[in-house]
């Protein structure tokens, strides 16, 4: 018995048989151990053939186990179990060897073991009974005229069924969504497939534009017989490259599998069209030391026209892998698949609408489809139509479906209230005092009312759920009937087609309309319903907002109020800069109302003014107002960009340089948060060439990073701050704080000397911040003290500062050329430091209020006023 003359599957079965013998404490390897191991082998051909012959495999395996248990086990020390082969097991191998010679094979394979077992083993004979000829016929079909010339012959049997899926068969079974449009690309593909040689189209396009859908569309046309005669009998197989590579343990096994697939395709005489998605993976697939990769194995067959192949890949991967191998590239004909426009996407969504309605059991409004196409095109810029629009619709449907499965909020609240009252009732029943009895009586009345309300709501919910279930069932029946009609028309079953088209389908459509009308009449408007089963444009807007962070959904009342009073909110934080606050808040309101220019940022402003007047503070307060956190502000300190080459930090290092994979500080931040406030602080400190990057952002609302990706800035507010002309402002401002026209001109002259005209011309507004007045300082004192009180609140301590003390603080710290920053430092010295010393020295108890007053010597006094009990 030469183990090298056996296939890997037979070798593995013998190894398993040794382990079985050891488990049963048998010195010999019995025939049943070998056959049981063969039956339990993963992807067992032995088992597969018996199953196809309708033999009870589980019972046969149990019979092998029972027979093994009848052999006498040997106990003792130093006994080597499973070291010898029994006489009957030896006969099995010898007979299998004779079958190997009969089949003209080079290795003993599983089918030889099965034929041998049918002749020698009584248990196998009993179960196979009179199916010997059937099994012989199945073995013949499985082998398909092949000979066992390798130790892994199983890969050659039904290779296409193992490593691919029949798209034409899936269309016939109704498993595939309809393909709408793409007629020109499908026709182009058909034209290339009809050539004599090099009849291999490769579909090239961005991810998500519908390359795979074109092949599915071809499969659907083949089923409908809507193709030229030369393609009528064709079938399309999608090759699963990962399945080909997976589990290839031995050298050359991958090549063997691929050869088996290609052989089947070749033997079909052009009937099989092979579709390889992500065809670039073929280049280098399976390549080890000295081995040939899959791409090179395909070349001869592709050139001779023996292999009909459709490939699909993206532009980048085609350039990176296929174009490098010019011999492989010339064997394919390119078909460019462009991204459909919004109108075509809406048509595609309308075609898919019914499938999604049936699958999710919801109703999709047409305006939801239009919104999905338009909003995805406008806001989801890093993906492609129609894929991103289909994803939006699918997600919105899933959201509504999830809501339908749970209780509505109104019923949920009543259920919680009833539970709460029942708990209180059971507690009060144990009390005997009059107050508890009185409360119990009131509570029982309230509980009765709530339970009545609960029953009414529950009944209404059940009724709506039942009606929705009926609608879903009717839609599913209609979908099945339409699928059956397509099958009947394809198979030329005219009688059945006529019955479905003129009888069943119109009747189902009528019943569905009646159900929908009744549901509409009974429930009234959508807003009156307990359960929503309609997907509207609002749901689509919500999903876009979830994905991008950009507020697209309709304004709720609280947000509407917040926007209308945005300037008031900003005024509370930014003192004395009315014009700047109004300009920024107006830009946000325009954007949220949906009337801003869709191709530019929400707003781009240059804030000019002395230090400490609120330029940066306005940007921070805007971020806090819009996003409830200053963290949503992208702050870039332009003093870090003083060198010319520093621009690469904004958009990313060029290819070949360290940090290329990390992307740019600005571009990556905006890609992650497309709706944000960008603050470019102290812009005059940056090198002038850095501003050239800003030209496209300010004008077109986009910027291309170092990797060639376009980053969308259309939903950002860009604020630049600068101190240019601050000296002119300080010297020439009126006592009232107003900026004169001559001062404004002088500042603009300074500005033009520094910035190029093309930068200034693209700004929405250049805002001059006026120096702070003494009145503004007293308001800022209040702000600083409020923030101090918030910090003290954590320690349950509060501070009260008298008006005299506040006025003194504002006056003493007033330095027009430095703005509000000296005031902050002055408050730290005069209030925070003495207070901190007192807290450490005396340790105030919780609830302490400290009063700060100004004495006659113009010094602040601290008094511990009261302690709250």
UniProtKB/Swiss-Prot annotation:
GO cellular component, one term: cytoplasm
Chain segments annotated as coiled-coil in the UniProt record: 390-524
GO process annotations (BP): cellular response to heat; protein refolding
Coiled coil among keywords: yes
InterPro entries the record matches: AAA+_ATPase, ATPase_AAA_core, Chaperonin_ClpB, Clp_ATPase_C, Clp_N_dom_sf, Clp_R_dom, ClpA/B, ClpA/B_CS1
Keywords: ATP-binding, Chaperone, Coiled coil, Cytoplasm, Nucleotide-binding, Repeat, Stress response
Positions of the Clp R domain: 3-145
Domain of life from the UniProt record: Bacteria
Annotated region described as Repeat 1, given as residue ranges: 6-71
Stretch list, region Repeat 2: 85-145
Any one GO molecular-function label of the UniProt entry: ATP hydrolysis activity
Entry keyword annotation includes Repeat: yes
Chain spans, region C-terminal: 772-869
Region entry NBD2, spans: 559-771
Residues given in the record as ATP 1 binding sites: 205-212
Sequence segments annotated as region (NBD1): 158-339
PANTHER family (UniProt xref): ATP-DEPENDENT CLP PROTEASE (PTHR11638), HEAT SHOCK PROTEIN 104 (PTHR11638:SF18)
Free-text comment about domains: The Clp repeat (R) domain probably functions as a substrate-discriminating domain, recruiting aggregated proteins to the ClpB hexamer and/or stabilizing bound proteins. The NBD2 domain is responsible for oligomerization, whereas the NBD1 domain stabilizes the hexamer probably in an ATP-dependent manner. The movement of the coiled-coil domain is essential for ClpB ability to rescue proteins from an aggregated state, probably by pulling apart large aggregated proteins, which are bound between the coiled-coils motifs of adjacent ClpB subunits in the functional hexamer.
Family: Belongs to the ClpA/ClpB family.
Functional note: Part of a stress-induced multi-chaperone system, it is involved in the recovery of the cell from heat-induced damage, in cooperation with DnaK, DnaJ and GrpE. Acts before DnaK, in the processing of protein aggregates. Protein binding stimulates the ATPase activity; ATP hydrolysis unfolds the denatured protein aggregates, which probably helps expose new hydrophobic binding sites on the surface of ClpB-bound aggregates, contributing to the solubilization and refolding of denatured protein aggregates by DnaK.
Protein name: Chaperone protein ClpB
Organism whose genome encodes this protein: Staphylococcus aureus (strain MW2)
Gene: clpB
